[in-house]
Amino acid sequence: MGMRMMFTVFLLVVLTTTVVSSTSVRASDGRNAAADNRASDLIAQIVRRGCCSHPACNVNNPHICG
């Protein structure tokens, strides 16, 4: 194999790796964001339930217990 051919193969490998990497990152970002939102909602519900059942916390945090 000549130097020009090896360089061409190298460029193709780099280009392919870049394309595959960028598409997989974009796809996983959406899944991670959805999972983060569900986790945040679950944590907020647990905190509300725990705080609102204690009178002192309920009085100090009326914005949480509504």
UniProtKB/Swiss-Prot annotation:
Disulfide bonds join 51-57, 52-65. Changing residue 62 to A: No change in ability to inhibit rat alpha-3-beta-2 nAChRs. Small decrease in ability to inhibit rat alpha-3-beta-4 and alpha-7 nAChRs. Expressed by the venom duct. One of its GO terms (molecular function) is acetylcholine receptor inhibitor activity. The record marks 63 as: Importance for inhibitory activity towards human alpha-3-beta-4 nAChRs, and essential to the secondary structure. It comes from the Eukaryota. The modification Cysteine amide is found at residue 65. InterPro entries: Conotoxin_a-typ, Conotoxin_a-typ_CS. It holds the Pfam family Toxin_8. Residues 1-21 form the signal peptide. GO terms for cellular component: extracellular region; host cell postsynaptic membrane. It comes from Conus regius. Its main location: secreted. Residues 53-55 are annotated as: Ser-Xaa-Pro motif, crucial for potent interaction with nAChR. Oligosaccharide chains affect the binding of this toxin at the human alpha-3-beta-4 nAChR through unstable hydrogen bond interactions with His-63 and by affecting the C-loop conformation of the binding sites. Residues 22-49 form a propeptide. The cysteine framework is I (CC-C-C). Alpha4/7 pattern. Changing residue 58 to F/W/Y: Gain of selectivity towards human alpha-3-beta-2 nAChRs. Very important increase in ability to inhibit alpha-3-beta-2 nAChRs, and no change in ability to inhibit alpha-3-beta-4 nAChRs. It is found in: Secreted. Keywords: Acetylcholine receptor inhibiting toxin, Amidation, Cleavage on pair of basic residues, Disulfide bond, Ion channel impairing toxin, Neurotoxin, Postsynaptic neurotoxin, Secreted, Signal, Toxin. This is Alpha-conotoxin RegIIA. Belongs to the conotoxin A superfamily.
